[in-house]
Amino acid sequence: WSDSPLKVEIRDGKIIIDAARGTVECVEAGSTLREAFMAASAAHFPASGTVPPDLFFSVPQYNTWIELIYNQNQEDILKYAHSIVDNGFPTGILMIDDNWQKYYGNFEFRPDRFPDPKGMIDELHALGFKVMFWVCPFVSPDSQEFRWLREKGYLVMDKDGSRPAVLDWWNGLSACYDLSNPE
């Protein structure tokens, strides 16, 4: 365990742990991966006792990615929702997936794809859907949000702690919110 970020890799049959800042505490707990996880959880991240709302377990969850992939847009989302209802499926939670926003770290609708987001959400609610939006902890590096987050110290830093780390994930290069920051 470490309270600071660390890097883990497997090389030549060995597990390599690199903690640029802080220390790593090695503890043996249990004889299975489950037992080790339960011990680590109890010591470092105990369950809060809260669970998602009952709705997440009692109604279908639909996701627009299956229909639209990166082409999330108001017209096709409404067509998808109407087709669910028109084909006799129950409404439930409708998650609008990646690419509804202008860019990562910005939570405004793309106006070229969503001319009336409030109207769309109102229509989805009228059909009986609860609406969720896909978000991720990434921020486009060349953005106003990135600069503000960097100034506040709200981003994961690189190995030497001198600047925000820019990560290569499946959707390009992004900085990442530091979710360990108590602010």
Name each model feature, range by range.
Residues C136-E183:
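Active-site-adjacent "subsite" loops/lids of carbohydrate-active enzymes
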Residues V59-E75, Q101-P115, D168-E183:
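The substrate-binding groove and active-site-proximal loops of carbohydrate-active enzymes
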Residues D54-V59, L94-D98, P164-W169:
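Short amphipathic alpha-helical segments, especially helix-boundary/capping motifs
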Residues N63-I66, M95-D97, H125, F129-D142:
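Aromatic-lined carbohydrate-recognition surfaces of secreted/lumenal glycan-active proteins
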Residues P117-L124:
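Alpha-helix-loop-beta-strand connector modules within alpha/beta enzyme cores
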